[in-house]
Amino acid sequence: MKVTKRRLWLCALLICMVLSILAGIAAPPAMAANISSTDWMETVPDETKLSNMSIPGTHDSCTQYVDMRYIFQCQDASVATQLIYGYRYLDMRLVLEKRSGQETLVLKHNIARCKVSDSPFSRTLTLADVLKDVYAFLDEHPSETVILCMKAENSKDDVADVQSVLYEAISREPDLWYLKNEIPTLGEVRGKAVLATRFDDKLPVGFERCGLYFGWADQGDRTILADPTADSVINGRETLCVQDRYNYDVDDKITAIHTCLDNSRAADDTFFLNFTSTSGSGKVGHPKEYAKHINLDLYAYAWETGKAYGIVIVDFAPKKIAEKIYQTNFQPTQ
């Protein structure tokens, strides 16, 4: 009887030891096949710098419905759908407009209005409309973050006024924003929108500038360069590297995109933006036709798992390309 009890005690002790060891073993890295497009950031470690990841983004994100669509449409899905597809960087073009005596921010692409529907009588899409979709997505998917890169689209607008109206809109939901000018870790911004701005600070002395500074020199020159990128400063310690050769023809643009994918400079201290969009020289046609060629190439590209490609910004952005990009953050399926 004593021997039996001792054996039982030893077995129980052994089981406890095994369970204790198993509890201390870290979970294996997430496999690409198990990743959901709505929650793909969930298994990325909290300490990962947002700049040292592969993040799908969209160019002129609010142009699903837009005036003169043949020229100005760059997306065929809503912002809400883009987020569901897995895109986490939104390119926002802001213009001041007076409504009921008050200035508000609306979305445009150049001179073309972004709209809430395809109706010719549709009202203009507002920043508030977009933020509503972003907030709703983050509420349902708190593991995620969304970078909103704001550009003052109308050169006649006073940038100080754009800043003031933008900051006032953000102040209504301050807990849902990351507003520092330093690259955060993913853990710092889960469930939040990250503000990035492409305009210089024009507010009076005493007013604090908000958000990451994403300003870069125009890259509309058609000169073909071996290195198509340009660097700028986020702050004294961190930099921005951008490829936005928006006037290259298809073949030259694809070469520029590949150069940046092959030689990505994404790092803890460097945000790397690789725009795949182009308006070209007119040889192929409108943005949708350019995107058709470029997106086929992106889908066929040999993406490497474990490599940080930075933010890859896409026109007419399909779910399958978002998947190709964000799956590089994870281990391949076995």
Specify the residue positions occupied by each region the protein language model found.
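Surface-exposed substrate-engagement region within the catalytic domains
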Residues: 171-304
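Bacterial N-terminal signal peptides that target proteins for export
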Residues: 2-13
